[in-house]
């Protein structure tokens, strides 16, 4: 005679196997869906949502692995107990999807869209096939100069490099037009950065050593063991390639990665970016979200200078944190630099009848002419150079978001 509790027991095991299979599938799916939903372009992220999504993404490989094992165990139970054929097939399908989900938690979706450039290659300035008016990020350290074309950087976002024995991360975010170079040294450790996602329109970076997440436009770690730490900024300039090549004829230029050259941005990529939707509300400021700014931070104070105003004026003298500031436009009428002006007053010579000496400004005190590198080329001040000030271009929505107390230059 059959045991009276056997059908009930078997029914209970069936329900348990089904619930384990379903739970494993949904948890594995959640581990993928939550980070992808929160850390994606054109969606506002608040700190707690971002923190939760990054936490889930960090735990996802472990959670999904447990789910996959549980789902496989449920399938094994279903076959051993000879459950109905359709039920075994359903559990097997759920198990397969759970295993696939577990594998996908190890995949960086953003690097599938924008592939890294792990072994960057360089060529001479003379050999580089870069248009004269294309923009490059210029870095010079210990006498070694390199240029990173923005159309290349806009796809890869991050290039880990070493210039003048200094490990650096050259970074660029096309959505907010920010090109910044950061030191990769933290507490004596050399970090290697990869693209990790996006936060309110600005790229996120993850270091391979600690899995900390860093904001590209501030260099501040917002998640992980290094949370709250800030990378050291390395001075760089955004210049036209023709101007950089004239200044650094022996410099090296980042070569395009042949595998992904077809993916690089078009020459007029900025026009397309300016039409994209932003997630930071700038309406109260009265400034359009895609107004391009030259941002300067000194002594804890930030100020945004509209690029259009700088290009029109060709020279702007202002103050930030009581520091006299000089902004000048280069001889290519496109590149910009910022310097500490000291006690001197400068006037632009861009429209004067000066011969082609490289002079772009003259000081009122001595009449000395100064070039775009900030150095006097004649007069009593000949040979002296102004101190460069770190500055970078940024769309207004991103600058305002990361510098909430910023001042704005009004022409």
Predicted regions: what they are:
Residues 1-3:
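N-terminal acidic, proline/glycine-rich, low-complexity intrinsically disordered segments
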Residues 5-411:
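Mid-to-C-terminal functional-domain signal that highlights helix-capping/loop sites
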